[in-house]
Structure formats: structure tokens, C-alpha cells
Amino acid sequence: AGEFDQRSSGSTILIAGRTPGDKIIVISYIFTNVNYDILSYLPSKLDSVKGENILEEDFGGGSMTIVLVKTVDDNGGKISPNTVMKLKNNISEIKNVSNVLWADNIMDTSVPGDILPDDVKNVFYSSDGEYTMMFVSYSEDASSKDIIKSVKEIKKILPENSYLSGISAMNSDTKEMTDSETPIYILIAVALAIITMMITMESYVMPFILVGVIGIAVMYNMGTNFFMGVSYITQSIAAILQLGVTIDYSIFLVNRYNEERKYSRTKEEAMARALHGSFISLSGSSLTTLFGFLALCFMQLTLGLNIGIVMAKGVIIGVLSVVIILPAFMLVFDSAINRHKHKPFTPDFGKFVNHIIKRKKAFAALFIIIIIPSLLLSANVKKNYNLNAELPDDATTTVGTVLLKEKFNMTTSHFIIVDDSIPASKLVRMENEISNVEGVSSMLAYDMFVGTSIPDSIVPDDVIDIVKQNGRQVMLVNSIYESSTDKCNEQVEKIENIVQKYTGSEHYGYVTGEGALYKDLIETTKVDFAVTSLISIIAVFIVIAIVFKSISIPFILIIAIEVAIWINQGISTLFGTAIPFIAPTVISCIQLGATVDYAILLTSRFKEELARGAGRTAAMRKAANEAIRSVFQSAMLFFFATFGVYLVCSISIVKSLCAMLARGSLISALVIVLFVTPILLLCEKLISKTTKGWGTHDDKPEPEPVVPAEVKKNIDEYEFEEETSFTFTDDGEDE
């Protein structure tokens, strides 16, 4: 099997720890652009996105913020319009603010708000007169860092009890929370990972080595995101996910090294044997996980492309760190690892494995029974598309959105952009029809306030500039329905049909804004989930088939993997919990990666024991005992790391993802141990006929491992955990 060179190990550590690129990577990570606007990942071909781009380019409104100003002081006195105008002017002076629309743009605000025309009053004043509303638009899109800074400046000058709403304000709140909480997530995940490894591993030193190696991999992965930028979701969970994915490979190698150390003359020989013996599980697991993440790149919502590339890159860097850097660290610090060994606090799985093997038909039958229910429950899980709901209740945007609904009878704003060459009389008919659509609370349009008989030449330029630019006209429609709900989607569809009726083929018309964008988000992700699931299944099937040179094994493992994913999502259905819209796609890829790691580890070890001459029952008993230890360590580590983040996280979308990841790690481990173990055993004859080079399958006593005489004489010097011994007999069953 060859040996490692001790000097090469030391050189590897030196290179890993002191490369000039380290500083560049850290600096790149700090300056990586983070996108907080999920809607910006929608395909550019959609009409809602085209309308949003026009709104941004011509009207500076693609990233509108609604400012709610309290007009009644604590003593019940009214705040003068001049005070509100002063605030408006101060907001206008903030960098990147292109326009601020308030009642004074329409008419003289010296007129008391309660005697203004209803059309104006309903748009700019709450029904009880307690709040007034102004619309702030910017010169850049909502995902821009500069806009987030501008929103932060607006917050600083807002009077007490004043709030913000809108996509740009929500992005600002999201940034503040992720910036403050992400370091906490990482610290908690790392701390819990170290504690879990110290409990389940043989040495108190090994967890720190693993975290150090994985830390290097995470640093390089996150630093190389500088060239493409990342979404805040990717930024929040990528490090934790890479920890979970890479730790599987690390644990597989460490446990295999400990096993080979007992039968090798030197530690270098043991490491070479461990790498050779782990090749199938490491290569198969990493390739399937890699293709699972790459499947996300086929999403129309390019958020999938962002997460997919970052995580696929993380898998590659993680595997390289495990096969290059980790062996070097383990060999150099071998004496320290051995000095601080202890008995791991892990259960003895011997009886558990015997129980599963003895009742293999019952466990296999149970697996078949739960396939359909888990699929149905998973298919009916409710998804939450409203990003406002992902923020805490006390966030500025959340409070502002609630006030909009309570005080102004509106929750969502739609923008309609039409060709300005359409006759005014025709536009008025369209506006009246839209105003009568169910759920529309108010509408702001040029002809509704100026009138069709007044020429543009006598209308003030500042009024025209707000609603007319470059041959286009924009209208604002306020809705009582919350974006992403069925009622709001139906409302948007009705408005789109009305606009199409009046614009026809001769003119253009777009409906955009939160409601339209969320509607397209829902329709887009429905297709995305089906496509990515199919692609990932096909890709993983092909990889498993190539790795094992088998037709039957991919079917067995893919079904087990999918059932684990269905159970995870189905639990949310049972408890009536809505999951983030991105969860089915992301969770399926990540849990697929974890489950396939465990499945390939067990299957490859089963094949290896058969090749050594063991009977099928003896081979599975040996394979399961060795594999379950690694599966247990990995599942516990990933569970506690993600569950810890779930407990402290304030952002609902990240919190929900971590909850499902934590739950999924346990489900994946249980599915592999409880169901794949007996199914592989029962199907071994079929597998042997459909797999090239599978090996023997008849039951026979397990041979003793071949131990070199030199190692036998000195084996007592090593402080390894005592292996569980089994006595295998041919029970005569056709297993």
C-alpha cells in the first residue's frame, strides 16, 4: 500500500499554515459582496423582473422604501405638515435617494390632512390620522450595498415611533442581523462540534486537529467567493454546511486509520492503508455530494446557482484537505494524539446490529410500508414564500408591515408601467377597473389626480417626473393582501389581465412590485424543485453505478436516500409547520449528501468484507459495526452543530433550515442503519449478479485478520479501543 514520508507531512503542515495566499483569502472574505435581496435572483426573462428593471432605470423605484411617520405626539397633539416636509427634505438629501413622494407632491399640504380629497388621504394618511406615509425611491437596486447604507441613514433621522417597510428596508434589517449573528453561529457550531467529537472519539486532541483542517478548507472556500459574491443565506450557512459535509470524510479516514494502525508496522503504513481502504467511500461520497450540489445550478432562480457553486467548491476543497492536509497533521501529532487517548463515550453497537440482522425481513418490510406515506406527507408540505415573515417580530420592517395593514389597510404595493402614448381616457378606464379589483385598497395614478383634460405643459415638472419618464408612465396600486398568499397571487393575475386588455399588442404594460415578484418566485421554484431533484437523483445514480460497477446498488441506495428526505419534510407536514420555499431544494441536496455518505460507507465496507472471504451475514455484521461508529459520530456532530445554531438564530429562514438539517442528520443515520443494512443483506444475491467484482456471498465463518508477526508482538503497546469480538456460524439460512 506504500508509506507516507514524515518529512513530507511536516512540509504539508508548513505550507498549509503559512502560505502567502492566506492573507489574500481572509481579505477576500471580508470584502466579498453579500446580496440580501432574494428576489433579485429571479430570471430576467420574467415580465415582473422586466418591469422592476424599468422601474429602477427610469423612475428610481425598484428599491422603494415606505416610511411611516407618526403624526400624533404622546400628548395627542398633531405634528404639523411642515415638520413632515422637513423630514422628507432630510431624507431627500441622503446619498442614493432619487425621490421622495408625499402628499405635498400632489397638492398643498397646508390643507389639514383630514379634509384632503379621499383619493389623496387614503394613499398618504391612515384612517385614524395617526400616521402619514411617504415613498422613498433610490438610484440603485435593492440588493446594492449603497442602498442598504442609505436605509441605515434614514433610520437614524426617523422620529420616535416611525417605521419602515419595503424590500430595501427588509434587506437592511436582514443585513444587520446576519452581520451580528453569523459569527455567533460559527462559534456555536465549532464549539458543539469539538465537544461532540471529544465525547465520541478516542483522543481529546483529534477534534482540534479536525476543526483546524476543516477551518482551513472553510477559509479557502469562503475567501474564493469574492469573485462571484454570495447571498446572505449562503453566507449564513455555508461554513456550517461545509463543516458537516467535510467532517464525514474526516471521520471515515480517522476511524479507518485507527483500525489499520493495529495491523500495520508503522503509522505511515497505516495511513497509506487507511487512504487506500477509504478510497471508495471517500470518492463515491464526495462525487455524489458534489453532483447533488451542482444540481442546484440548474435552478431558474439563480440563488440555487449561488449556493450550488459555493457548496460544490466546498466539497472539492474539503476532500482535498482531508486526503492531503489531515493525514499530515495526524502523522506529525501522532504522539500527542496517543498521549491524550480515552475511552470514547459511545454505545456498543454490537447487540444493536445483531438485532437488526436477526430481524432483517421485518425491518425491510417496515421500510417498504413507510415509502408511500413519507412521499405523500413530503409532497404536501406547506412552503413559506414571504421573506418579511423571516424577520423577528420586533424588527423595524416587521413592525412597519404590521402598521401598514392596521393603519392603511394595505400590505403590498403593485407597480404598473405602461406606454405613455396610450390615450388618457383609455388609461382612466383601466385605472377604474383596477381600483375595483377585490383587495385593492387605494391607487395612485397621474390621470386620477390631474385629470384627462389638463395638458402636461401646465403640470409642475416635479409631479410629472415622478410618474412619467422616457415615454413610460407608472401607477401605484396598494393591496390589503399579503404578498405570496393565494389571494394576492390571484389579485396580481387579475390586474395583469386588465393591463393586457388595455395595452394589447400595440403597447406594452408590466405589473411588478412585491406581489408580482413573489408570484413569479412561487411559480419558478415549483419547477426548480422538480428539475433539481430529478437531476440530482440521476447524477447520484450514475456516480454510484460507476463507483460500485453495479446496476442494483444505485436503486437500493437512491430509494433509501429519498425516503430519508421525504421523512424529514413529511414531519413538517405532520406538525403543520410551513418551511422556507428554498428548503426542499437545499435540504434535499444537503441531506442527499449526508445520507449517501453513510450509505456508500456501509456498502463499500460490506463489499470489502465479502472480498476478504467472509460470508454475507458475517460480512454485514462486521461492516455494520465498523460503519455505524462513523455514522453515529458524524450524525451526532452535525446534529448538535446545526441544532445549536437553530436555538440562537433570529432569522427564520436560517433557523428553519438548521432545524431541518439537524433533524435530517438523525433521520439519515437511522434510515441507513435500520433499513439499508437488512436490505443489502437480503438483496446480496441479486447484487452479486448485477455488480462486477462483488465477491463471494455464501455464509461461512469470518477469517481472522492477518497481523504481521512484528505487530503481533508489540500490539499491546498501543492503547487502542478493544474491538468487539464475534463468533460467526453458518446458520444455514439463505442470506
Residue ranges of predicted features:
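Membrane-embedded transmembrane helical bundles of large multi-pass transporters/channels
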Residues: 1-36, 40, 142-383, 503-735
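Structured non-transmembrane domains adjacent to transmembrane bundles in polytopic membrane proteins
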Residues: 43-65, 70-171, 382-553, 559-578, ...
